[in-house]
Amino acid sequence: MTERAVLAGGCFWGMQDLIRKLPGIESTRVGYTGGEVPNATYRNHGNHAEGIEILFDPEKTSYRQLLEFFFQIHDPTTPNRQGNDRGPSYRSAIYYVDEEQKQIALDTIADVNASGLWPGKVVTEVEPVSDFWEAEPEHQDYLEKVPNGYTCHFPRPNWVLPKRAATE
C-alpha cells in the first residue's frame, strides 16, 4: 500500500535528493504548495512553499520515520529560511493528508521540541494538504543532474530523536 506525504523544508533540490534515497520511497517530485496561486511556476508561485511530494511504502519507512528524517536534514527553527535561502518559499511545513498524519506530525514536533536537538522551538507549519503544482522539469531530480549543485540540506550525524516520556 502506497501512502503520500507532502513536506516543505527550504530549497526543494536538497530535500528531494536526500529523501528519495530512504527505503521504501517509491517516487518524489518537487513543486509548489501551501499557497493560493493556481498553476504555480518558479517565476510565479506567490505565497507557495517549495515542496516535495513523496509516495512511499509505510511497511519500509513509516510516516513517523519520514518526519524524523525531515527534521534531521533541515533546520525547523528558522522561520522562512534555510541556509542562504530566505523568504516564505523556504518555510518549513508539513501538509497532512489525513487526521492520522496530522497527529503524527504534532507528536513528532513535540518530541523535537522536548529533545533539545535544535537550539530553538520548531516553527514548522502543520496544515492540510492543498494543491501541489509540479515544478518545471529542470527542477526535478536536480542534484542527480548537477551532482555538485547547491544544497543546504544534510543529515546531522548521530541525530536520533527520542520520544517524550508519557507524562510530558
Swiss-Prot record:
The active site is at 11. It is an enzyme of class 1 (oxidoreductase). Keywords: Oxidoreductase. One of its GO terms (biological process) is protein modification process. InterPro entries: Met_Sox_Rdtase_MsrA_dom, Met_Sox_Rdtase_MsrA_sf. Signal peptide: none annotated. One of its GO terms (cellular component) is cytoplasm. It catalyses: L-methionyl-[protein] + [thioredoxin]-disulfide + H2O = L-methionyl-(S)-S-oxide-[protein] + [thioredoxin]-dithiol; [thioredoxin]-disulfide + L-methionine + H2O = L-methionine (S)-S-oxide + [thioredoxin]-dithiol. One of its GO terms (molecular function) is L-methionine-(S)-S-oxide reductase activity. The keyword Oxidoreductase applies. Its EC number is 1.8.4.11. NCBIfam families: msrA. PANTHER family: PEPTIDE METHIONINE SULFOXIDE REDUCTASE, PEPTIDE METHIONINE SULFOXIDE REDUCTASE MSRA 2. Has an important function as a repair enzyme for proteins that have been inactivated by oxidation. Catalyzes the reversible oxidation-reduction of methionine sulfoxide in proteins to methionine. Belongs to the MsrA Met sulfoxide reductase family. This is Peptide methionine sulfoxide reductase MsrA 2. It comes from Rhodopirellula baltica (strain DSM 10527 / NCIMB 13988 / SH1).
